[in-house]
A protein has these predicted regions:
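ATP/NTP-dependent adenylation/nucleotidyl-transfer catalytic domains that generate, transfer
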Residues: 116, 122-200
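ATP-dependent adenylation/nucleotidyltransferase module used to activate substrates
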Residues: 1-123
Length: 200
């Protein structure tokens, strides 16, 4: 995740625990780093999109098991919006068993525009991720095969240090794979188009 997203989570947790002291927050994390999975599986790509399942969904289900509810029925409110992508424009406001049988996805802001989102946030004085104020159009992972050039440029300028290990890993894979123009491969997102089981 982007550093300001993690910071925002902490701020929101602190804010709501001050208001509701009995409110419990649980954090689901994978037992290994995302880069260790890159070593095993290769970079995620627009064809091999393993990252969300491995780094987000699986840890949530593991957390349910740890907390004693192996077959928890889950209602997830997510913030996806139709204007974000062609795929998302085909989503319904309610998705039953879309990725997992026991999960219902509710998408209350699916048909909202970006302007409507920010007007709502400002009107209700809600926390806003700093990355939006820095110019990002979508806030998600620090590096993503579905990321756009604009967000990548901002991430490289604002989050050079946390981004560096990922770009170094992409360069290493490119070198191992015999890519001639590594700078171009990394800069133009060649790693995002990986379609085979190979690392590049």
């Amino acid at each position: 995740e982007l550093p300001p997203s993690l910071k925002l989570y902490q701020e929101i947790q602190h804010h709501y625990q001050a208001l509701y002291p009995d409110l419990k927050f649980s954090t689901a994390k994978n037992h290994a780093s995302v880069l260790s999975y890159w070593d095993k599986i290769g970079t995620p790509s627009n064809k091999h999109r393993w990252c969300c399942a491995v780094m987000k969904t699986a840890p949530i289900y593991r957390l349910f098991k740890i907390e004693g509810n192996k077959q928890a029925k889950v209602l997830t409110f997510d913030g996806v919006r139709a204007e974000e992508s062609t795929r998302r424009s085909n989503y319904g406001r309610i998705g039953k068993g879309v990725k997992h049988d026991t999960v219902i996805n509710a998408r209350p802001i699916l048909n909202w525009s970006t302007i409507e989102i920010f007007l709502y946030l400002w009107r209700h004085n809600l926390h806003i991720n700093v990355a939006y104020r820095q110019g990002m159009t979508r806030v998600g992972c620090l590096i993503c095969p579905f990321g756009n050039e604009w967000n990548e440029m901002i991430a490289q300028k604002k989050y050079e240090e946390p981004l560096s290990p990922f770009l170094t890993k992409v360069e290493q894979f490119a070198k191992k794979g015999g890519i001639k123009d590594i700078k171009n491969y990394v800069g133009e997102g060649g790693w995002k188009r990986r379609a085979s089981g190979d690392l590049v």
